[in-house]
Amino acid sequence: AQLGSMSAASWVGRGVLIEGDPKVAFGDATQPLDGEEKPSDSFSFLLSGDAETVTVTLTDDEGNAYTAQLKDVKSGVKTYTLDDLENFQPEPGPPQDREYTLSFEAKNPEGDNPEISGLIQEQVSGVTMTANGAVLHLLNHDPITMGDVVVIQK
């Protein structure tokens, strides 16, 4: 999709979802360091097909991992909050005073497992036009191409 320079300029300031490992925190658990954004308790992923279960793994900076499941998830871009996760293993679940990196696994009983990719939200801070098309410069991420964008937000 070739975008003209005028339409590319309209991307500046917009939020985009791109593939990556989302970070989350429970409620008011963590205070961000100066200049850093506070992690949200919501997360998104892209699912290529319907899944009976999506296993969400929360891993803290020390490598401690906790898993929970989402049931009967339809294909597409999905957004949940940590409150949607139940039955954490191991019990009693993750301490709520730290940040976690998420990873995902989708499964079906027939073994026909859809692809699943974590999504991270970034903000477009600038656009460069190159011979290969527009390059989006993001606030907290390396530059990406238009093709790397999964969802455009307002």
Give residue ranges: language-model regions.
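Type III/flagellar secretion export determinants
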Residues: A1-K154
